Amino acid sequence: MTDTRNGEDNGKLLYCSFCGKSQHEVRKLIAGPSVFICDECVDLCNDIIREEVQEAQAESSAHKLPSPKEISGILDQYVIGQERAKKVLAVAVYNHYKRLNQRDKKNDDVELGKSNILLIGPTGSGKTLLAETLARLLNVPFTIADATTLTEAGYVGEDVENIIQKLLQKCDYDVEKAQMGIVYIDEIDKISRKSDNPSITRDVSGEGVQQALLKLIEGTVASVPPQGGRKHPQQEFLQVDTRNILFICGGAFSGLEKVIQNRSTRGGIGFNAEVRSKEEGKKVGESLREVEPDDLVKFGLIPEFVGRLPVLATLDELDEAALIQILTEPKNALTKQYAKLFEMEGVDLEFRTDALKSVARRALERKTGARGLRSILEGVLLDTMYEIPSQSDVSKVVIDESVIDGTSKPLLIYENSEPPAKAAPDA
């Protein structure tokens, strides 16, 4: 084959044999035996092949479901700790998609029910990351919804059916794909009703939303306007069956540990009562492991809603050692991400052990868990990331504890020179 650019073959104007455009209308025209193809048609063919390969891979991965151990092993690469939660999620997700793979088989007199999941754990403990990693592993559409923005139909705010619309957007409005997806509803504890007793007043963002979510989570046919349009009577809707969508709800449930402790430590009063010291109190994570459906009802979730979330997984608070692991070990660890950014500038980035410990301590003080690690590192590295692109002679940047504490600046090591003395502490 020859590449015919903007020259003519024997004074004759050449055309693409596929789209009919002349050589002057395209960037390149490739010549074959008695045929020509332009660069635009080549790009189009590549796109078609790429789409077909992706669809074939998606179909094969749907039939090749990883085992619970394999699922947990992949979660280990991204999420530190939380072994119990990983095991619960791996089994629940495996059973859910095994059920979907079997649903078309005839002469099966046993109908398997759907097991939606409730994740309970402190802020920054990895609830959202677990759900995201599961969806990526299984190659299914995934969306995150914030329960605090949801209201009952007819009130200002997001309708619960908007959740399904977001899921459709993730898969280009392919209804079949959406019906195999995963929905993560965050901050689910924020829609708890304010007291144990049903209120006579309308609670449009609490109990009312729980009622609206019931059918969606259990399984219904949701009517969603196509391509994200607004609803109006003359419009045709996309019908999405939610029976096979896996719903994972997550929340911090602050104060739930007190409900559990009150139930488990209920005792008598008087001289014969058992005396308990404050030191005997359990950690939040240990208390949450003992949660029962009645505790969630007392917290403010309605019994019907609790019943729709039969699989319960609790996550522990992250300690200093776990936060240091999160900074360094996962595939997407923050220190690896920042090292990659510096590497693009031809600079090595080194975090000393005392610096990592200091970052972890600051995150614990802020009570933000792993979520606060990035903001701490961003603040520490901001000035360095601003200056480095303008300095071509820097070969290495070293971060130690004093840099994290703000008492000194990062150590810059220059090419072909002795390492300079550390910068004096800021006045």
Curated annotation (Swiss-Prot):
ATP binds at P122, T123, G124, S125, G126, K127, T128, L129. SMART domains: AAA, ClpB_D2-small, zf-C4_ClpX. The keyword Nucleotide-binding applies. The gene is clpX. It comes from Pseudomonas syringae pv. tomato (strain ATCC BAA-871 / DC3000). ATP-dependent specificity component of the Clp protease. It directs the protease to specific substrates. Can perform chaperone functions in the absence of ClpP. GO terms for biological process: cell division; proteolysis involved in protein catabolic process. InterPro entries: AAA+_ATPase, ATP-dep_Clp_protease_ClpX, ATPase_AAA_core, Clp_ATPase_C, Clp_protease_ATP-bd_su_ClpX, ClpX_bact, P-loop_NTPase, Znf_CppX_C4. One of its GO terms (molecular function) is ATP hydrolysis activity. The lineage of its organism: Bacteria, Pseudomonadati, Pseudomonadota, Gammaproteobacteria, Pseudomonadales. This is ATP-dependent Clp protease ATP-binding subunit ClpX. One of its GO terms (cellular component) is HslUV protease complex. Keywords: ATP-binding, Chaperone, Metal-binding, Nucleotide-binding, Zinc. Residues 4-57 form the ClpX-type ZB domain. Zn(2+) binds at C16, C19, C38, C41. Belongs to the ClpX chaperone family. Component of the ClpX-ClpP complex. Forms a hexameric ring that, in the presence of ATP, binds to fourteen ClpP subunits assembled into a disk-like structure with a central cavity, resembling the structure of eukaryotic proteasomes. Gene3D superfamilies: 1.10.8.60, ClpX chaperone, C4-type zinc finger domain (6.20.220.10), P-loop containing nucleotide triphosphate hydrolases (3.40.50.300).
